[in-house]
């Protein structure tokens, strides 16, 4: 539930470099960068900006979710550690 709540607050920035068939989706939690997804097609004739954004975001969402699990897991582990004195 915590990861889903965090994912609901992720903001997205998109890039489509001019002259390419590449699209990038960048995920941010506040000002903290989480992940980037990328999509591209071989043929410029087949390039569709909307599909590029969709596929790049899908990839970035998976990476962002994985990063949040990693960070939340670390935060939990750190809160449970007892340092030897």
What is each of the regions a protein language model found here?
Residues 1-85:
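Domain-level marker for long, solvent-exposed, non-transmembrane regions
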């Amino acid at each position: 539930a915590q990861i889903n709540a965090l994912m609901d607050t992720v903001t997205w920035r998109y890039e489509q470099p001019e002259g390419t068939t590449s699209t990038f989706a960048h995920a941010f939690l506040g000002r903290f960068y989480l992940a980037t997804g990328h999509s591209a097609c071989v043929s410029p004739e087949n390039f569709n900006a909307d599909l590029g954004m969709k596929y790049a975001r899908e990839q970035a969402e998976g990476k962002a979710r994985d990063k949040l699990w990693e960070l939340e897991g670390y935060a939990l582990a750190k809160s449970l550690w007892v340092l030897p004195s």
